[in-house]
Amino acid sequence: MAKNYAALARSVIAALGGVDNISAVTHCMTRLRFVIKDDALIDSPTLKTIPGVLGVVRSDNQCQVIIGNTVSQAFQEVVSLLPGDMQPAQPVGKPKLTLRRIGAGILDALIGTMSPLIPAIIGGSMVKLLAMILEMSGVLTKGSPTLTILNVIGDGAFFFLPLMVAASAAIKFKTNMSLAIAIAGVLVHPSFIELMAKAAQGEHVEFALIPVTAVKYTYTVIPALVMTWCLSYIERWVDSITPAVTKNFLKPMLIVLIAAPLAILLIGPIGIWIGSAISALVYTIHGYLGWLSVAIMGALWPLLVMTGMHRVFTPTIIQTIAETGKEGMVMPSEIGANLSLGGSSLAVAWKTKNPELRQTALAAAASAIMAGISEPALYGVAIRLKRPLIASLISGFICGAVAGMAGLASHSMAAPGLFTSVQFFDPANPMSIVWVFAVMALAVVLSFILTLLLGFEDIPVEEAAAQARKYQSVQPTVAKEVSLN
């Protein structure tokens, strides 16, 4: 049965406290992300029971509504109900600064910046894999123009990642996007890259008598992110000191002259060191624990997705693949985690007597197993029924251990699933093909069996029908409150 996205959007907005309680909305691959003015106006119990809503995640003033793979359709309906000139709400007061709030702010900035970039990163990754397969199979020869262009297409999103990060972060930090892109562009300019290559070879490089640290910024996330955050403060300060008559030309010139050298001399190197330190910590643990670290990550992955913490690993994965050509801890652990959620959803679809739950579970299983998108299975089935989540965690640990022992590593960062399994193929290790499909099969079968053994409390058909009637009774009152520009 097709979802009524218009009714879904009306119900979600009503449960969030109406149009007047929403200051901004965006979406990632599976979630609608609302910025809320007053959390007290949110009707969480109603929001969670709206058919089509797989789950709800709260974070400070943001409410994330999990829809699944069709989130873009729901997003279009939500946007149609909101004012076209919507502006973010002004903060009522300055919140108290605590370590928890600082940590939450950093995580929110990272997730808010990286989430819109994931489609471009995955698209580039898959094109690079296609080029690798065509070369391995002999369809294209090494050095051929077609292969070179394919590699350039696949590499574009990674090489110019600082520009993409700057653009996305500018939206997040509410600063001028063109200035952010211009300053990030300095870091990947061919002349600057050449200068940094000379510095790396020992040649003294300075700017205004200040030594410049030899750093490579292509394929990086943290430097551009920190730089754009600093730019948001620099822009406000420069705006406050420049006369109104000179703002058109003096303000942008001063901003660039302040922010660009600051990025080159201080912010950029610090950002690289932070990123390198995080990567070193993660892979030092992997070096000590070996396959056990992959197993632990496989069990924890669904819990990390629940909190949004899984996005923390995105910069680390990108940097590791850029430096070594593959990643062997986080990505292999996702094979078992994603397909285990798919297998447990299949078991629920097999066992349930609720037609609506069966339909939800089958769709969620297909999404997790085929495409590696596990959130519909996680929120729509596993968390909802609890015991399938336990089965998935156990299966994820065991499959992670097998993937770690087999030495599987990914050459891309697409969500691991059947369609993206090619990213784990290693030309130097033909058995990697066998191992990746073996781990996938084990994940589906093991989680399926464990879910049947543990059982689950089925949702009565009467309850589902009552929820559907409640959903259909929602009137489009929200639409009357909005100016449809």
UniProtKB/Swiss-Prot annotation:
Enzyme class per UniProt: transferase
EC number: 2.7.1.-
Transmembrane intervals: 102-122, 147-167, 177-197, 207-227, 254-274, 285-305, 330-350, 363-383, 389-409, 433-453
Compartments reported by the entry: Cell inner membrane
GO-annotated cellular components: plasma membrane
Pfam families xref list: PTS_EIIB (PF00367), PTS_EIIC (PF02378)
Keyword Cell inner membrane listed: yes
Residues in the signal sequence: none
Ranges of residues in domain PTS EIIB type-1: 1-88
PTS EIIC type-1 domain: residues covered: 108-470
Active site: 28
Major location (coarse): membrane
CDD domains for this protein: PTS_IIB_glc (cd00212)
Keywords: Cell inner membrane, Cell membrane, Kinase, Membrane, Phosphotransferase system, Sugar transport, Transferase, Transmembrane, Transmembrane helix, Transport
Gene Ontology molecular function, alphabetical: kinase activity; protein-N(PI)-phosphohistidine-sugar phosphotransferase activity; protein-phosphocysteine-trehalose phosphotransferase system transporter activity
The keyword Coiled coil appears for this protein: no
Gene3D superfamilies listed in its UniProt record: Glucose permease domain IIB
Membrane topology of the entry: Multi-pass membrane protein
A biological process from GO: phosphoenolpyruvate-dependent sugar phosphotransferase system
Function, as annotated: The phosphoenolpyruvate-dependent sugar phosphotransferase system (sugar PTS), a major carbohydrate active -transport system, catalyzes the phosphorylation of incoming sugar substrates concomitantly with their translocation across the cell membrane. This system is involved in arbutin, cellobiose, and salicin transport.
Domain notes: The EIIB domain is phosphorylated by phospho-EIIA on a cysteinyl or histidyl residue, depending on the transported sugar. Then, it transfers the phosphoryl group to the sugar substrate concomitantly with the sugar uptake processed by the EIIC domain.
Protein name stated in the entry: PTS system arbutin-, cellobiose-, and salicin-specific EIIBC component
Organism listed in the record: Escherichia coli (strain K12)
